[in-house]
Regions:
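Residue-level hotspots at or immediately adjacent to binding/recognition sites across diverse folds
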Residues: 1-159
């Protein structure tokens, strides 16, 4: 399968790939002007992911059974300060799931699905205090606080 990263003259970026049987999935995003729009491809067919944010990018894709999970990060703007806030997000079968508590930003770095459990690793917090950890089914589990360059970048579940 081929993926056209210049569809309709736009610049595109492929960010992840997953093979499930005979199906090939890829995550990515297109840039339309200054706006980044998330997509994924299945067997070369482009499928748009809808986001409430002005800018959203993808980073990973995972398939479990018939469910397609695409991980990414969005930029939303604080309604009080108008400052940009990064928010981790994943889409399950095209439905957007935000990884935030509406009080602080977050970043999603990797995703793994085991049975019905969805694990996402990353961090949440503000510039003053970052909590590294993971989400399981949307609930954040902090592992440590750090303002250093240390981070969590991948997750796997072994049973």
């Amino acid at each position: 399968y081929a993926i056209d990263l210049t569809s309709e003259g736009q610049n595109g970026v492929a960010t992840g790939i997953f093979v499930n049987g005979k199906d090939v999935y890829a995550s990515g995003w297109y840039e339309e002007g200054k706006v980044k729009i998330p997509f994924f491809w299945k067997n070369g067919q482009l499928l748009r992911l809808f986001s409430k944010a002005e800018n959203a990018v993808t980073s990973k894709i995972f398939v479990s059974g018939n469910d397609v999970y695409v991980l990414g990060n969005e930029t939303i703007y604080d309604p009080v300060t108008s400052h940009p806030v990064s928010t981790g997000v994943y889409w399950k079968n095209g439905n957007e799931i935000l990884l935030t508590n509406d009080k602080e930003g977050s970043q999603a770095n990797s995703l793994f699905v085991s049975g019905t459990d969805v694990y996402v690793v990353g961090f949440r917090g503000s510039f003053e205090k970052i909590k590294h950890g993971y989400w399981i089914n949307g609930d954040f589990v902090p592992l440590y606080d750090s303002m250093n360059c240390t981070g969590l970048d991948d997750i796997f579940i072994v049973k």
